[in-house]
UniProtKB/Swiss-Prot annotation:
Protein's UniProt name: Galactose-6-phosphate isomerase subunit LacB
EC number from the UniProt entry: 5.3.1.26
Classification of source organism: Bacteria, Bacillati, Bacillota, Bacilli, Lactobacillales
NCBIfam families xref list: lacB, PRK05571.1, PRK08622.1, PRK12615.1, rpiB_lacA_lacB
Source organism: Streptococcus pneumoniae (strain Taiwan19F-14)
Entry's family note: Belongs to the LacAB/RpiB family.
């Protein structure tokens, strides 16, 4: 399995630790940088990771910045990416099993290296569990990302909101 990884200058050391962990587990790591602490901008590396995943160069991606918010927003702008910003196992597994996430994002100054490694390994081994409901949710996400004309419809999310109101979704 090939895993693309990228970060900004704030978490280079954390990214290197994660990269070494993945290599020790036998994964091929495609490291898009950054490689030092020279100030840079996370959108560059989020985009590179996202493009590697959607092109098939990598099977999954890992993005890390200080809080995870910036790089995760950047990678999610790449059409075809479904990235989840996580800091716990439950969220990571939900993202992969229910939403077929193909990138996982972390705040390297929020989540410790060992926990990131444990979560990434679980994310890699988790499998998407398709259902009619999550297929519809993923389709809605894809319609938004492709600027589908339906998204200008004021009722675009009505079906899901009605199901929520009826108690069909549970936290």
């Amino acid at each position: 399995m090939r895993i693309a990884i990228g970060c900004d200058h704030i978490v280079t050391d954390e990214k290197m630790a994660v990269s070494e962990f993945l290599k020790s587990k036998g994964y091929e790591v495609i490291d898009f940088g950054t490689y030092d602490h020279t100030r840079t901008h996370y959108p560059i590396f989020g985009k590179k990771v996202g493009e590697a995943v959607t092109s098939g160069q990598a099977d999954l991606g890992v993005c890390i910045c200080g809080t995870g918010v910036g790089i995760n927003n950047a990678v999610n702008k790449v059409p075809g990416v479904r990235s989840a910003l996580v800091r716990d196992m439950t969220t990571a597994l939900y993202a992969k099993e229910q939403l077929n996430a193909n990138v996982i994002g972390f705040g390297g100054k929020i989540t410790g290296e060992l926990l990131m490694c444990d979560i990434i390994e679980a994310f890699i081994h988790a499998e998407y569990k398709p259902s009619e409901e999550n297929k519809k949710l993923i389709a809605k996400i894809e319609h938004v990302e492709t600027h589908n004309a339906q998204q200008t419809d004021a009722n675009f999310f009505t079906e899901f909101l009605e199901k929520w109101d009826r108690g069909e979704y549970h936290d």
